[in-house]
Amino acid sequence: MALTHLQQLEAESIKIMREVAAEFENPVMLYSIGKDSSVLLHLARKAFYPAKIPFPLLHVDTNWKFSEMIEFRDRIAKEYGFELLVHKNPEGMEIGISPFEHGSGKHTDIMKTQGLKQALDKYGFDAAFGGARRDEEKSRAKERVYSFRDKHHRWDPKNQRPELWNTYNSQVNPGESIRVFPLSNWTELDIWQYIYQENIDMVPLYLAKERPVVDRDGTLIMVDDERMPLLEGEVPMMKSVRFRTLGCYPLTGAVESTASSLTEIIEEMLLSTSSEREGRVIDHDSAGSMEKKKREGYF
């Protein structure tokens, strides 16, 4: 019997995960707590069932994630029983890096990019799973499934290995590593249909709800805690919003929506003509912003 579209994607991702677990000495899964990470975690549990996942999950905590994301992370880790590593850049924490005071570019570089590189060096990981997909953004569209990184964790799009069909090159020298993207060929719609099919638990922020937001240059920013400074005369508005992508709350824009169930989200996706990452402030720091970040070691 022929496999469905989602079954083909699932089989491809599981094969990649098993291959990485067999070929690399010390792999890790980057866990950002979003919908793609939740699908990645579900696939990993399937890939190695009934055994436990044979590698840890790593969350690079910027100290500015939505509070619901952290609550979800801790609950899922406890329920599923996987090894969870949480890393915060100690230098960034010491000087109190903030997206409000220091700007999105500096905050992202210190707390995300440098924080990730610190964690990868600390534990000596030679392969790191990520949930990036090619349909998300143009620099990710040209990234390999096995994305080679040099000893400084930098990505050079001109220095990548050919990938013929489903054959991948896992050879690295000491200090080098591979970022592995099992969801490369999935789309945002595929992700939501798979979440619905498999009944995967996810952060409630993806569902529409009345939330306090402020309009900053056309981007709806949710007031998640008392650390967010309001501008003079600015008053949070209660709007029915949801998030298509999750990150640091001051840098993540909400979309007005009434989609409060998975079926409604899927219906919304079928009509959508915009990228989910339009709400990511960090993607608009400068032209080619995401590619520049990836060259420096970003996810």
Swiss-Prot record:
EC number(s) given by UniProt: 2.7.7.4
GO biological process: one example: hydrogen sulfide biosynthetic process
Family matches, as SUPFAM superfamilies: Adenine nucleotide alpha hydrolases-like
Pathway: Sulfur metabolism; hydrogen sulfide biosynthesis; sulfite from sulfate: step 1/3
Catalysed transformations (reactions): sulfate + ATP + H(+) = adenosine 5'-phosphosulfate + diphosphate
Superkingdom of origin: Bacteria
Enzyme class: transferase
Location of region: Disordered: 276-299
One Pfam entry name: PAPS_reduct
Protein name as it appears in the record: Sulfate adenylyltransferase subunit 2
Gene name of the record: cysD
Originating organism: Pseudoalteromonas translucida (strain TAC 125)
Function description: With CysN forms the ATP sulfurylase (ATPS) that catalyzes the adenylation of sulfate producing adenosine 5'-phosphosulfate (APS) and diphosphate, the first enzymatic step in sulfur assimilation pathway. APS synthesis involves the formation of a high-energy phosphoric-sulfuric acid anhydride bond driven by GTP hydrolysis by CysN coupled to ATP hydrolysis by CysD.
Family per similarity comment: Belongs to the PAPS reductase family. CysD subfamily.
NCBIfam families: CysD (TIGR02039), PRK05253.1 (NF003587), PRK12563.1 (NF009214)
Keyword terms: ATP-binding, Nucleotide-binding, Nucleotidyltransferase, Transferase
Record-linked InterPro entries: PAPS_reduct_dom, Rossmann-like_a/b/a_fold, SO4_adenylTrfase_ssu, Sulfate_adenylyltrnsfr_sub2
Complexes and interactors: Heterodimer composed of CysD, the smaller subunit, and CysN.
Keyword presence, Zinc: no
GO MF terms, alphabetically ordered: ATP binding; sulfate adenylyltransferase (ATP) activity
